[in-house]
Amino acid sequence: MKFFKKSYTYAACFGLLLTSSFSYSILKTFVLSDAIQTVKATTTDTKAAKKAAASATTTDTSYSDDNIQVTLTEKTVENTQVYIVDITVSSADYLKTAFAQNTYGTNVTAKTSVTAANNSAILAVNGDYYGANSTGYVIRNGVVYRDTVREDSSNGDLAIYKDGSFKIIYEDEISADQLVKDGVVNLLAFGPSLVENGEITVDTNSEVGRSMASNPRTAIGIIDENHYIIVVSDGRTSESEGLSLYQLAEVMKSYGVKTAYNLDGGGSSTLYFNGQVINKPTTNGTISERAVSDIVYIGY
């Protein structure tokens, strides 16, 4: 009788342990914030942003002040609604990044529009959604938050330097600390690169599962010093099919970019400008924003 009681007790304890472990795993994946580090100092200069906004000239498709000029145009490419943003800044300091909830950590997310508004962004798009992965460098505002090499480093990362220049780097070739020493301020790890040295780096026959698929897209490129372009496309709807990576690269090249890089796309693709969402983000078949880990933005 004692044997059965002991066996029952052990079984019950083991079952409770398994249940607790499974429950925690589910919570960690879908619920718990698991904030690793709160970013105490934001780079946003609220006073400067308010001053600039007060004197800026704005329309539905443009923004202009003494330091920042933004022009938005829309066009149809391959049955897809595409938004092109031309950006000129007086200093690379106005090209910025921000974490959702001003916090670095897995499962810490917010809609692009919310993070943008919290940082007084003039223009913003979703970033690389670093929180969806457990590996890959995370460098923001010159701080290394994660230094483990991404599982697939062949895609390359977009390194943004203090002077505003872009370079495609590969994590298995250089450490995160060395990148910061070399002047990297922000690093975006999604990919792949679309254009390097003015030439398209993807083709219609490579990465068929990704390049040939029509999807919403977000990409950023550099034309010249302090002159950038952001392209966002809608997709997955009857009105807008979406772009392949090659088609996205073609759009970028047509604007004369030297380097262009593919950011997180699909349901994450969101364009925020002058206080509102411009495109039509799709999440689970509906027009709505997806919460993401981070944004790239123009602002003070």
Where are these regions (language model features)?
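Zymogen propeptides
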Residues: K2-E151, K167-I168
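Extracytoplasmic
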Residues: T80-V82, A92, N118-S120, S153-N155, ...
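Conserved, well-ordered active-site substructure
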Residues: S134-D152, N205-K258, S268-Y300
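Active-site-adjacent helix-turn-beta-strand microarchitecture at beta-sheet edges
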Residues: Y63, Y130-S211
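Structural recognition of the beta-strand scaffold that forms the well-ordered cores
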Residues: I122-N126, D157-I160, K167, G221, ...
